[in-house]
Amino acid sequence: MSMMKKEIVLTAATMLFSMVASTTFVSATEVYPKEYNTEGTITFEAGDEGVTPPVDPENPDPNKPVDPSDPPSPGTGGALSIDYGSKFKFGTQKISTADKTYYAAADVMNDGSRKPTYVQVTDRRGTLSGWKLSVSQPEQFKTASGDELVGAQLKFTKGQAVSLVDPTYTPQTVNSELTLTPGGNNTLAINAKS
């Protein structure tokens, strides 16, 4: 009988060892998981990096600013800024008694390339609250001696907007053609709605 007791004890000990080994294995898996998730945070503030250099109006790339040969005054800077606005140069024209249309010359760059006249606006507020750009002509054109050029008009055509970031942020309301009234109210050129 003592042999039978030894076998039963030995069998019971083997079963107990198997259960402990099995439990240890499961426990090891729980201690070393295969996946771990964590959280990260970032806070954005409105930018105020100064004036953004002008970019090519037809192929805007912030890493390739253009270099105008006769730049206008520096832009406004700030979180919402007008960075660049072309000078309108109509050249020397012959006086005529007939109605004439004169076109502003393209902006000449220091590399010799020519770009259409344009205005560049940068919005670094991060609010998507929209903005508007209006233009005005404070008074009628005048000759060098100060005489008004009666009936002269400043007309903008083919207006369009381009976004450097994503087409989703391109202003949807762009006045593609507008005529200014000398001494009149501001005329809306672009409305970047929120």
Mark where each language-model region is.
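Signature of Gram-negative chaperone-usher
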Residues: M3-L10, T24-S194
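Bacterial N-terminal signal peptides
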Residues: A12-A21
